[in-house]
Amino acid sequence: MVTNVIFAKEKSTLYSMTYDYAHLICFSPTHSSHMIGETVLQGLGTGHVSETDLTYEKPEENLTIHSGITVIVVPVYGGRIAETALERMEGIYGQDSPAVAVVVYGNRDYDDALLELRDWCVAHGFVPVAGAAFIGEHSYSRPNRPIAGGRPDNPDLQKARAFGEQVGRLLNRFQTLDEVAPI
């Protein structure tokens, strides 16, 4: 279930701003965030995708993303972005590149995590154009005590893909990123 979807407001409608290149940045200890991120990218329909998986280690060097759209997906622990994710994202920057902020939470609440990720995007040179929160199996889930067991499931993934499609349609309405009011 998509619990919250935010899109940038348009400043004006012109022709088309399309992206053939996308970058996925994710921290996904339970693989839920990665699954959601890949599905959002499928919905965006970009040609080439590169990935920075922060689950096991941070990049050896700072990373600056100059082109394409970046989908950033992180889990929520206790209503906040996982501290380890923030530490590993520290050397990642955008150069006025559009970003989609996505948080995945364990069916409790994501509190201000989506806002926190949006603020991180702005502080690191990205222009957040859309954001969403999705449910993934809670890290405390056990077979005898499932918490959002099996999530994201097919309906969740369909919604993630539809979200990516919506973001793609939004961006196709503009020629430049300057025309999009960030979220």
Where are these regions (language model features)?
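FMN-binding flavodoxin-like domain, especially the glycine-rich phosphate-binding loop
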Residues: T3, A8-I183
